[in-house]
Swiss-Prot record:
Region (G2): 423-427
Region of interest (G1), residue spans: 398-405
Full protein name: Translation initiation factor IF-2
Function: One of the essential components for the initiation of protein synthesis. Protects formylmethionyl-tRNA from spontaneous hydrolysis and promotes its binding to the 30S ribosomal subunits. Also involved in the hydrolysis of GTP during the formation of the 70S ribosomal complex.
Region of interest (G5), ranges: 534-536
Length: 890
C-alpha cells in the first residue's frame, strides 16, 4: 500500500495537521508534519480512536402497540380499523461535563418557567379580585338607589302590590347572580390567555437558545463531537415537554382545554398522536388553524451548498465520486451528461473527467498521485558516476530477403540464418561483436510487414540504423517503412547496398530511389554514408564497420558504467525448463547476477545471465545484450528494466502497475463514444473468426496478433480469444473448444493432454513456421465467411416488331433477337427509349407456336412478359441472369 504524509492524511480527514500529530502522539506514535504514515500506523491510530470512543453513544428503544377501533359507518354498520402506534426513544451518552451543563440549564429553565407561571397566576388572581370588588361596590350603590326609589314608591302604592314587588326582587337577585358568574368566567379566561402567552414566550426563548447552542457546538468539529441530529432531537423533546406542561396547566379551564382532554374509555387516549393534536389545538386558539404537524421533523435544509475538498486518485468510479461529494449518484450522472459523457454508477472514470465533474458541481479538487511509491523507488538509485564512452547499438533494417541476417552472420562469422524458418528472421536477435577498432552491438529485426512494431521497438533502442538495400531489387515497401521509423526516432542512417557482386546490380538506381525519401549520399551533399557490400563474398564489410564507428564517434555516445543498471527488454519468451526468459539490452550502469530488477508488470532477482552465445556471465555493462532468468513472469517486449534496492517495494510497484493497467483498460473499454454507436448497432450481423494463438516468443505473438486483427473487415472480424508464449496446453485446447476457435501454433507444438482434447473435440489445429502461410490461410478462412457478391450479366436483347393478343398470356410481343440469347424464365427488363419501364420475368417463349427454352441471335420469337401488358412496338426486351462471385479478403 502507498505511504502518505501527515499533511496529505490531514487534508483527506479534513482536520488540522497539529490535531492529527497530537492524535498520533496520544496513540504512542511520534510524528512530524512531513513524516510518512504507513498502513500499520494508520490502523494503530484508528484502534486508539475507537478505544477512546468505546461504548455505544446511542441507545434506541422502540415499542409497538396494536389495537382495533370500531368506527360507525353508513347503514348502521360499524367498521373495524387496525391501529398500530409506534413509539421510539433514543438515549444519548453524553460527556459528564456536558450533561451537568445541560442539567443546570434545564433546571434554571424550569425554575424560570415555574416562577413566571406563579407570577402570572398571582397577577391574574389579584386583578380578578380587584375587579370583582369594584363591581360589587358599584352593584351595592345601584341597589341602594333602587331601594330608595322602591321605598318612596311603596308609600304611594296600595298594600295589595306587595306580592308583585317580592317577585320582582327575586328576579333581580337571580339576574345579579348570573352577571357575577359571567364576570368571573371572563376573568378566568383572561388569566388563562396571559398564562399561555407567557408559556409560549418562554418556550420560544428556549428554542432560540437551543438553536444558538447547536451552531456553537458545530462551529468547531472534533473527532468525538455529538451528532447534529441527536442535538436537534434533544431540543425537540424539551419543547415537547414544555408543551405538555402547557396542556396540563390549561386542563379544566376553557373550551380548548376541555376539547384537548381525552374521552373516558378511549384506548388511544394516551397516544403520542393525541397529545400532538391536543397541543396543536391549544396553540391554535379558539377556532384557529393547526400550524404544527404531528410528524414534523427538526431537520432544516441548508441555506447554501456545502463546498467540500474532494480527493481524487488516478481512477475512480462514479459512485465513489458521488459519496466523496455527499450527493446522489444520479446528480453526478446528470452533470456528466451535461459535459457530453455518458456513464453508469459503477463505471470507472479517469482523473481528468472526475476533476471536471467535481469542479462543475462547485467542489475543490485535490489530485492525489498514486505512483508516489514508484517514483520513490525509481529515484532511490545510485547513478551519479561520471559518464564514459560506450559501444554503439546498431539496428539492421531492410526489406525481406535483402540480406540483413546474412550480412550480420558474416560479421559475426556464425550462421544463424539456418535456424530461421524459410530463411526469414522470426524474432529479434541481439549480438555484440569485437572489432579491431572497438565493440559494436547489433540488433537484427525481421523485415516482414507484420513485424512493424518489433522494428519500431528496435529503432527506439538503437543509436545507428544500417539500412540494407539489395542492389538488384531497389527500394521496396519495407525499406520505406524502415526509413520512416529511423526518421521518427531521429536516428542517423548508414546505407549498405548489398548483393553488389550480382551482375544485375545497379547501385546508382538505389541512390536515386533513396533520394526520393530524403536519404542522400555524402557525395551528393547529403548526410548518409553509402557502402557497397556483399554478404556472400565479404566485400565491403570492413568499410561498413568503419562507417558505423565513424558515425558513432560523431554522436559521442556515453553512458554511466558504474551504478545500478537500466535498460530495455528486446525479446521475451517462456522456456519450459528455465521459466520466463528476457533478452535485455543494458543502457546505463552494470547489471550483476543477483540484482533485483523491476521490469514492467514483473519483478524478480537475476538468477542467471547468459550472453548471445549461451555462456554464463556475471555482469553486463552498457550496450551489452544478455538473457536474464528469475523474473516473476514474461515481460512485454519494450518494457523498461530497472535495478532497485528492495525486492518488497519492487513487488508493490509491479502489483500497482498491474492493477493500474487493468483499471485504465476497463475505463477505456467502458467509455461510450458517439462514433461507436453505429458499429454497435450492426454488431449482430458480423461474422467472427475466433483464434487461439501460441508462439515461441512474445514479439511474434504481438506481431501476428496485429497482422490478424488488421485483416478484419465490416463483415468478418478476427477475434484473438487467447494468446501466449509457449507450447499448446490442455487449457488452450479447452478454451478453443468452448469458443469454437482455431488453434494456431507458431513454432510450438501441442502436448499429449492437449492432443487428446483436440482429437475428442475435433478441433482445427494448425502449425506454422513462416508467417506468410499463417496469414494466407486465415485470409482464406475469412473469405469463406464472406457473403457472395451478386452481379447481373446481360445475355440477350430482343427488339419488339409487333404486338399480338393472347387469351391465355395477354399481350404477346413478336420480337427479333438482336444480341446474345433469350432464355425462358429469366429475369427481363423492358426498355422504351433506353429507359427501363418494367422489370419482371419472361413467362412465355415460343417459336412457330412451339414452346422453346431459348432463342439465339437473328431469330424471331414470341415473348410473353409475366404480369405486364403494356408492350409496344419498338420496345427492347433485355434478358439477364444473376451470377454469384466469390469474394476474397484483399
Amino acid at each position: 500500500m502507498t505511504d502518505v504524509t501527515i499533511k496529505t492524511l490531514a487534508a483527506e480527514r479534513q482536520t488540522s495537521v497539529e490535531r492529527l500529530v497530537q492524535q498520533f502522539a496520544d496513540a504512542g506514535i511520534r510524528k512530524s508534519a512531513d513524516d510518512s504514515v504507513s498502513a500499520q500506523e494508520k490502523q494503530t491510530l484508528i484502534d486508539h480512536l475507537n478505544q477512546k470512543n468505546s461504548g455505544p453513544d446511542k441507545l434506541t428503544l422502540q415499542r409497538k402497540t396494536r389495537s382495533t377501533l370500531n368506527i360507525p359507518g353508513t347503514g348502521g354498520k360499524s367498521k373495524s380499523v387496525q391501529i398500530e402506534v409506534r413509539k421510539k426513544r433514543t438515549f444519548v451518552k453524553r460527556d459528564p461535563q456536558e450533561a451537568e451543563r445541560l442539567a443546570a440549564e434545564e433546571q434554571a429553565q424550569r425554575e424560570a418557567e415555574e416562577q413566571a407561571r406563579r407570577e402570572a397566576e398571582e397577577s391574574a388572581k389579584r386583578e380578578a379580585q380587584q375587579k370583582a370588588e369594584r363591581e360589587a361596590a358599584e352593584q351595592a350603590k345601584r341597589e341602594a338607589a333602587e331601594q330608595a326609589k322602591r321605598e318612596a314608591a311603596e308609600k304611594d302604592k296600595v298594600s295589595n302590590q306587595q306580592d308583585d314587588m317580592t317577585k320582582n326582587a327575586q328576579a333581580e337577585k337571580a339576574r345579579r347572580e348570573q352577571e357575577a358568574a359571567e364576570l368571573k368566567r371572563k376573568a378566568e379566561e383572561e388569566a388563562h390567555r396571559k398564562l399561555e402567552e407567557e408559556a409560549r414566550r418562554v418556550a420560544e426563548e428556549a428554542r432560540r437558545m437551543a438553536e444558538e447552542n447547536k451552531w456553537t457546538d458545530n462551529a468547531e468539529p472534533t473527532e468525538d463531537s455529538s451528532d447534529y441530529h441527536v442535538t436537534t432531537s434533544q431540543h425537540a423533546r424539551q419543547a415537547e415537554d414544555e408543551s405538555d406542561r402547557e396542556v396540563e396547566g390549561g386542563r379544566g379551564r376553557g373550551r380548548n382545554a376541555k376539547a384537548a382532554r381525552p374521552k373516558k374509555g378511549n384506548k388511544h387516549a394516551e397516544s403520542k398522536a393525541d397529545r400532538e393534536e391536543a397541543r396543536a389545538a391549544v396553540r391554535g386558539g379558539k377556532g384557529g388553524k393547526r400550524k404544527g404537524s404531528s410528524l414534523q421533523q427538526g431537520f432544516q435544509k441548508p441555506a447554501q451548498a456545502v463546498n467540500r475538498d474532494v480527493v481524487i486518485g488516478e481512477t475512480i468510479t462514479v459512485g465513489e465520486l458521488a459519496n466523496k461529494m455527499a450527493v446522489k449518484g444520479s446528480q453526478v450522472i446528470k452533470a456528466m451528461m451535461k459535459l457530453g459523457a455518458m456513464a453508469t454508477i459503477n463505471q470507472v472514470i479517469d482523473q481528468e473527467t472526475a476533476q471536471l465533474v467535481a469542479e462543475e458541481m462547485g467542489h475543490k479538487v485535490i489530485l492525489r498521485r498514486e505512483n508516489e511509491l514508484e517514483e520513490a523507488v525509481m529515484s532511490d538509485r545510485d547513478t551519479g558516476a561520471a559518464a564514459e564512452p560506450r559501444a554503439p547499438v546498431v539496428t539492421i533494417m531492410g526489406h525481406v530477403d535483402h540480406g540483413k541476417t546474412s550480412l550480420l552472420d558474416y560479421i559475426r562469422s556464425t550462421k544463424v540464418a539456418s535456424g530461421e524458418a524459410g530463411g526469414i528472421t522470426q524474432h529479434i536477435g541481439a549480438y555484440h561483436v569485437e572489432t579491431e577498432n572497438g565493440m559494436i552491438t547489433f540488433l537484427d529485426t525481421p523485415g516482414h510487414a507484420a513485424f512493424t512494431s518489433m522494428r519500431a521497438r528496435g529503432a527506439q533502442a538503437t543509436d545507428i540504423v544500417v539500412l540494407v538495400v539489395a542492389a538488384d531489387d531497389g527500394v521496396m515497401p519495407q525499406t520505406i517503412e524502415a526509413i520512416q521509423h529511423a526518421k521518427a526516432a531521429q536516428v542517423p542512417v548508414v546505407v549498405a547496398v548489398n548483393k553488389i557482386d550480382k551482375p544485375e546490380a545497379d547501385p546508382d538506381r538505389v541512390k536515386n530511389e533513396l533520394s526520393q525519401y530524403g536519404i542522400l549520399p555524402e557525395e551528393w551533399g547529403g548526410e548518409s554514408q553509402f557502402v557497397h557490400v556483399s554478404a556472400k563474398a565479404g566485400t565491403g564489410i570492413d568499410e561498413l564497420l568503419d562507417a558505423i564507428l565513424l558515425q558513432a564517434e560523431v554522436l559521442e555516445l556515453k553512458a554511466v558504467r558504474k551504478g545500478m543498471a537500466s535498460g530495455a527488454v528486446i525479446e521475451s519468451f517462456l522456456d519450459k525448463g528455465r521459466g520466463p526468459v528476457a533478452t535485455v539490452l543494458v543502457r546505463e550502469g552494470t547489471l550483476h547476477k543477483g540484482d533485483i530488477v523491476l521490469c514492467g508488470f514483473e519483478y524478480g532477482r537475476v538468477r542467471a545471465m547468459r550472453n548471445e552465445l549461451g555462456q554464463e556471465v556475471l555482469e553486463a555493462g552498457p550496450s551489452i545484450p544478455v538473457e536474464i532468468l528469475g523474473l516473476s513472469g514474461v515481460p512485454a517486449a519494450g518494457d523498461e528494466v530497472t535495478v532497485v534496492r528492495d525486492e518488497k517495494k519492487a513487488r508493490e510497484v509491479a502489483l500497482y502497475r498491474q492493477g493500474k493497467f487493468r483499471e485504465v483498460k476497463l475505463a477505456r473499454q467502458q467509455k461510450s463514444k458517439l462514433e461507436n454507436m453505429f458499429a454497435n448497432m450492426t454488431e449482430g450481423e458480423v461474422h467472427e473468426v475466433n483464434i487461439v494463438l501460441k508462439a515461441d516468443v512474445q514479439g511474434s505473438v504481438e506481431a501476428i496478433s496485429d497482422s490478424l486483427l488488421k485483416l478484419s473487415t465490416d463483415e468478418v472480424k478476427v477475434k484473438i480469444i487467447g494468446s501466449g508464449v509457449g507450447g499448446i496446453t490442455e487449457t488452450d485446447a479447452t478454451l478453443a473448444a468452448a469458443s469454437n476457435a482455431i488453434l494456431v501454433g507458431f513454432n510450438v507444438r501441442a502436448d499429449a493432454s492437449a492432443r487428446k482434447v483436440i482429437e475428442a473435440e475435433s478441433l482445427d489445429l494448425r502449425y506454422y513456421s513462416v508467417i506468410y502461410n499463417l496469414i494466407d490461410e486465415v485470409k482464406a478462412a475469412m473469405s469463406g465467411m464472406l457473403s457472395p457478391e451478386l452481379k447481373q450479366q446481360i445475355i440477350g436483347l430482343a427488339e419488339v416488331r409487333d404486338v399480338f393478343k393472347s387469351p391465355k398470356f395477354g399481350a404477346i410481343a413478336g420480337c427479333m433477337v438482336t444480341e446474345g440469347v433469350v432464355k425462358r424464365h429469366n429475369p427481363i427488363r423492358v426498355l422504351r427509349d433506353n429507359v427501363v419501364i418494367y422489370e419482371g420475368e419472361l413467362e412465355s417463349l415460343r417459336r412457330f407456336k412451339d414452346d422453346v427454352n431459348e432463342v439465339r441471335n437473328g431469330m424471331e420469337c414470341g415473348i410473353g412478359v409475366k404480369n405486364y401488358n403494356d408492350v409496344r412496338t419498338g420496345d427492347v426486351i433485355e434478358v439477364f441472369e444473376i451470377i454469384e462471385i466469390q469474394r476474397t479478403i484483399a
